[in-house]
Amino acid sequence: MISVGIDVSKGKSTVCILKPYGEIMCSPFEMLHGEKELNALDDLLNKLDGEIRIVMEATGIYHLPILTFFHEKGYFVSVINPFAMKKYAKDNSIRGAKTDKLDSIMIANYGIEKWFKLQRYKGDEEIYAELKLLGRDTIWNFT
């Protein structure tokens, strides 16, 4: 069980890798959203033993390059509603402290605590296929 918390910003992100009970496998570090940096993170994750889940907040469009990269690589990626993360952080943090590093730790910790409730991101092609099936079911049920 390995949770990768990514605090996404414009052009860069802060990444923290945690195991259960708050064990930090990789201290928070910054990375750019370039292909070289994403491949380096992918290489790091491939060296880890255990099931990996990548967790990030939805941030308008800024999270999309990271989301797409890791989804296409076959990772379990979960995109969290910012309001849910804000509530979680409020309920679980020491008041006043807010930095990108602390946010990445908080997001990774959210991934550990909500491990079995995390929803895996489905790519657009999967969503459109499901909508197509739903549309067919609706037509079949009305005829």
Predicted regions, residues:
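Phosphate- and other anionic-substrate recognition elements at nucleic-acid/protein interfaces
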Residues: M1-T143
